[in-house]
Amino acid sequence: PMGRTNHGELIDPPRPVESLRLQTAAGDWFDWQSVQDMWSMTLVSEGGCDAACIEILILVRQLRRATAANRQRIARLLILMPDANGRLELPNLGGLEGTQLLIADSSQRGGVESLFPLQLSEQAIPIFLIDPRGDLMMKHDTTKNSSKEILQDLEKLLKASENWAQGGRYGHQ
């Protein structure tokens, strides 16, 4: 086996996300099939998306742009869940068009917390990667990983996956 060269933390085993029932800002149920065959750079936030969260969303947008021709293979997701008091403030994503805002209601909070390794009390807002199969597979700590390191991981994953079958589950059921 080749030596590990990734900068992010691998989530092993990968965790399927399709069981999460999330709503779009318009109130429709989010269809995970809409991001099938794409890498999803995902943020999870509680209560809303403050200035630090918006900064990371801007970083995600810049990282996606930096992948040039591959940018069409990357989705940007922001999963919001209510805070401990049940409050949820929808952020203004002006300038961040293309970021899909997904809302986990209080009944889905446990599902989000069990899937995504979160330390909500910490200042760091991690960037999670969901692979084209719909499995959560990597986490980047934005206080430890530089944007260059995150981009290197992203480019490696895009290159490694460019020949994956489109529309299939790659031999997995």
Predicted feature residues:
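N-terminal "domain-start" segment that seeds a small globular fold
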Residues: P1-Q33, E55
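Short active-site neighborhood of thiol/selenol oxidoreductases, capturing the structured segment around
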Residues: Q33-V60
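Extracytoplasmic
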Residues: Q36-M38, R71-R73, E122-A124
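Sec/Tat-exported extracytoplasmic proteins
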Residues: L43, R64-R71, L154, L158-S161
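Structural microenvironment flanking redox-active thiols in thiol-disulfide oxidoreductases
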Residues: A51, E55-L96
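Extracytoplasmic/secreted envelope proteins and their assembly/folding machinery
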Residues: L57, R61-R64, E113, L151-L154
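Short, internal strand/loop/helix patches
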Residues: L77, D83-A84, L88-I125, I130
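Thiol-/selenol-based redox modules, centered on thioredoxin-like
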Residues: Q123-Q173
